[in-house]
Amino acid sequence: MIFYTDGSCLANGSINAKGGYGVVGVDDEEKVQFVRARSETGTTNNRQELKAILYVMLNFGVKCDDWGQPPIVYSDSAYCVNTFNEWMFNWARKGWIKSDKKIPENLDLIQAYYDWYKEGYRIDLRKIKGHAGDQWNELADQLATGYISEEEAYATYG
């Protein structure tokens, strides 16, 4: 299964912020097999993007010694792809401090992902261009923004 993730936030970073994330899992026949949408207040778009990817890692990540390939996960967030594919390893080595001597934002989510990574779990996280017409990325965006519900996504694309 291939996953597409997205996060969204209105009034990003403010006390009145309302955000959400969407996850879409598509099988080899281009049928939606899994959707997830969650929302919360007092958040940021980056936090929601990270949560979507973390959800896939925790629920569908493949342990290195298991049979099979890790699931491919597409995100349109360069921040998230770079965080989980590169930056977190340097931050962990330096005691979770960035080069500017600051603690990374969303450290709780990054450390949760890193802990699973250290246990041998993997996903194949890749960057996709956002809002470029990919129907599954667009569906993840619609779930994240609340434009479409999980039930509507299954009924339309399942």
PLM region spans:
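RNase H-like nuclease fold core
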Residues: 1-47, 58-62, 141, 145-152, ...
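RNase H catalytic domain
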Residues: 8-14, 55-139
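Short, conserved alpha-helix that lines the donor NDP-sugar binding/gating region
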Residues: 49, 53
